[in-house]
């Protein structure tokens, strides 16, 4: 909203009913001094790992939801690199059904390829119809350019986003650092990054 102001907020039955400067308190209202705090619409995290199913000793849908809400995030997008991978409608439905009971909005991506192997494309149509919000082989680069381009075209035809984790691991000995002054000072082999964009003209 491009609005940063000091305001009073009235909340009734858990709903914000009024925002204005210098509201007059009503009889019986509880008044909280929130000086120094920021009130904003719910935040959205577009890249979370709830590790559910399969790796729930790290995180699960419920604990991830609680952590998100505690940090002010009311919507999250979960990555598809679970065990099993979110490459089938059954796995996607299981996650989305269990997510319904949580108090935040949980969206789930599906994988681009079966088993994150970068070889055979998942059924984008069926997964989109079942509620996938996008496609990603998160953490696994799609090194086959033809396969990657075909996946991008399919996602575009469905008006769905595709998220890529594109680095050639053969060039990277320490993930997360690009070639430059810092990598030279540290003596870390790194690689320059290139931003690739495919589009229709």
Task: Tell where the protein language model's regions lie, with residue ranges.
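Active-site metal-binding motif and surrounding structural segment of the metallo-beta-lactamase
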Residues: 24-39
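Short, acidic/polar
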Residues: 58-65, 117-125
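N-terminal metal-binding scaffold of metallo-dependent hydrolase/deaminase domains
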Residues: 1-27, 200
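Histidine/acidic-residue-rich catalytic or RNA/ligand-binding cores of hydrolases
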Residues: 88, 170-183
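Conserved small/polar residues in nucleotide/adenosyl-binding loops
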Residues: 194-201
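Active-site mouth loops of central-metabolism enzymes
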Residues: 48-59, 109-118, 189-190
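Metal-associated gating/positioning segment near the N- to mid-region
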Residues: 37-99
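Divalent metal-dependent hydrolysis catalytic cores, especially in the metallo-beta-lactamase
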Residues: 62-86, 100-114, 128-143, 159-163, ...
């Amino acid at each position: 909203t491009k609005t940063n102001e000091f305001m009073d907020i009235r909340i009734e039955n858990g709903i914000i009913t009024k925002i204005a400067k210098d509201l007059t308190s009503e009889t019986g209202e509880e008044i909280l001094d929130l000086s120094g705090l920021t009130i904003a619409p719910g935040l959205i995290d577009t890249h979370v790992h709830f590790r559910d199913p399969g790796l729930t000793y790290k995180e699960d849908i419920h604990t991830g939801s609680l952590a998100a809400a505690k940090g002010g995030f009311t919507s999250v997008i979960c990555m598809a690199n679970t065990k099993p991978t979110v490459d089938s409608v059954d796995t996607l439905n299981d996650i989305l059904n269990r997510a319904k009971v949580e108090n935040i909005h949980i969206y789930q991506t599906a994988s681009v390829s079966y088993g994150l192997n970068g070889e055979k494309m998942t059924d984008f149509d069926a997964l989109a119809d079942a509620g996938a919000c996008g496609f990603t082989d998160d953490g696994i680069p799609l090194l086959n350019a033809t396969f990657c381009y075909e996946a991008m075209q399919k996602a575009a035809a469905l008006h769905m986003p595709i998220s890529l984790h594109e680095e050639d691991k053969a060039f990277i000995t320490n993930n997360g650092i690009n070639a430059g002054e810092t990598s030279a000072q540290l003596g870390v082999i790194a690689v320059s990054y290139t931003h690739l964009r495919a589009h229709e003209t």
